[in-house]
Amino acid sequence: ALIFSLTSCSLDGGADESTEEMGNSMSSADREYLNVSDNIGSEPVIGKPDGIAPTQLVSRDIVVGTGTQVVSTSTLTVHYVLISWATGEVLQSSWSGAPAVFPLSGVIQGWQQGMPGMKAGGRRLLVIPPELAYGASGSGPIGPNETLAFVVDVVSVD
């Protein structure tokens, strides 16, 4: 499998999180979607997607956070990497600058459905089919009918 080597960055306030709870690491069933490093607070290392893209939303915790839980009305501060399922290419990443801040209600349906329940301090994989993302029109570097994979670190929840 091809692994992208990404530059590591420190995240202010990044404390060591407990890794004793179940669900902190991806199971072998989850790894069929995508290999993602669990180095919370640093830019994730992401393997190239393998196989046919899922047709349903995939929302899997890689690291379970211990902070405030995301709800539909939350404003999130996150670091994320977005890759194309088809090519494995990184399309966007917040890791080269400050974390992104936005209301969950203002983003694509895949995030609105896949982020609630996550806790600050965690890392989650979202694999989002086109109908919950940008559909047939695409957007910027995102092609039409493209399945997207996001790796999201929640820094804080307001």
Named regions from a protein language model:
Residues 1-158:
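Cross-family detector of peptidyl-prolyl cis-trans isomerase
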